[in-house]
Swiss-Prot record:
Cofactor needs: Fe(2+); Ni(2+)
Biological classification of the source: Bacteria, Bacillati, Bacillota, Bacilli, Bacillales
Site keyed May play a role in transmitting local conformational changes: positions: D104
Family to which this protein belongs: Belongs to the acireductone dioxygenase (ARD) family.
Name of the protein: Acireductone dioxygenase
Organism: Bacillus anthracis
UniProt GO molecular function: acireductone dioxygenase (Ni2+-requiring) activity; acireductone dioxygenase [iron(II)-requiring] activity; iron ion binding; nickel cation binding
Signal sequence range: none
């Protein structure tokens, strides 16, 4: 279950109902998908082959199709980041630059952890700390950035409005 940390006051929201309500009020789509469907050989596997990535997409194809139909998404892929990722530190520096997109940024966490820091409607940033099974859609034009948690590893399904993917606006 995702948790929220509000930056300026360092307040945490950990209750599932309160997290969902907070995100809904901020216009952030949040869903919990059944991660137990993931085959054991893909759980916490950060060295994925193309076949592994295709298998992950197949496992969650129904959920991807459902959210895509509801929200108009047209493409998806799988990304894996870990200490074995070449240039991980450089990638994280780039991910941590505050930006926005003219379409939603959608991620479903398959393994590991990630954090989206999002500017709230009142101008205060909050972290959404994500774990396996969490799906988030950062709304279009919302200022945000992404980083990893202390374990520095994540496998995520990215879902896009267009086949070209997101274009960050810094």
């Amino acid at each position: 279950m995702a948790q929220i940390r509000i930056h300026e006051v360092n307040t945490r929201i950990e209750n599932e109902v309160k997290v969902s309500k907070f995100l809904q009020e901020e216009g952030v789509l949040y869903e919990k998908w059944n991660i137990s469907k993931l085959p054991p050989h893909l759980n916490e596997n950060y060295s994925l082959t193309d076949e592994n990535k295709a298998e992950i997409l197949a496992v969650f194809s129904k959920e991807i199709a459902d959210v895509s139909a509801r929200r108009g998404y047209k493409a998806h892929d799988v990304i894996s980041l870990s200490n074995s990722t070449p240039n991980l530190d450089e990638l994280l520096i780039n991910f941590q630059k505050e930006h926005h997109h003219t379409d939603d940024e959608v991620r479903f966490i398959v393994s590991g952890h990630g954090i989206f820091a999002i500017e709230g409607k009142d101008g205060t940033f909050f972290d959404v700390e994500l774990e396996p099974g969490d799906l988030i859609s950062v709304p279009e034009n919302a200022r945000h950035y992404f980083t990893l948690q202390d374990d520095r590893q994540v496998v995520a399904i990215r879902i896009f409005v267009t086949t070209e993917g997101w274009v960050p606006i810094y």
